[in-house]
């Protein structure tokens, strides 16, 4: 199997994540701190004296923060504001804050959920709560194959297993190995890994990158080895790191799956270090005590 361009895939995810972070700022949403503070205090607002700009701001706040007196739909009916204003900010906020009621209202009012290259479904695929919104977006035209199945890749990178299940229910033919390659190897979680393995993802993708980057994380290592991860991708340096983890459980499972830790005996030791160790041993210090001293794991010193 050809290698996936993991670097490019991860870069695309990182760029979108940065966009999401910016989206969550008041600078992007054009909500003033003063207005938000007042709204969160459940203050009474004279809505009959608001400029159009302030009407829009109030409607945004009604999505971001619930208010007993001002619902988005009621405000929309009163103000007659263009629901696609500010680059469809109402749609984006409804998705970001999992407001299913507002999203349905926007769709019924003619808002296109595919705007900005299907930004809405891309965003929702990374949000853990209320994944019914994904169904709502898809059933109203959202394209889950956009940008080389980006919603799948983003859901995987955000550890959103429930979103992945929904996405696969619509298109089960996506190569799960592509999703595995799109995650930063050092950030993958066991639940997502197990789910992708259940879809026959190749755990040795990109020369065993996932095992190499997670060689001390037991849940991931256990899943990888059980799924057939090739331990030959582990270098001597990896074995040294595993030993230095002082985790007997993880060493035991590696041994169970055929890892030969004796390979570290081939490490080239500098002459001055060898002389130092030999001197200590010649003076009667046992090698096992030296090992504990050098690893800072000798818990008790006895006189």
Curated annotation (Swiss-Prot):
Source organism superkingdom: Viruses
InterPro entries: Ankyrin_rpt (IPR002110), Ankyrin_rpt-contain_sf (IPR036770)
Listed SMART domains: ANK
Keywords: ANK repeat, Repeat
ANK repeat locations: 86-115, 117-146, 147-176, 200-233
Protein name per UniProt: Putative ankyrin repeat protein R601
Provenance organism: Acanthamoeba polyphaga mimivirus (APMV)
Upper lineage: Viruses, Varidnaviria, Bamfordvirae, Nucleocytoviricota, Megaviricetes
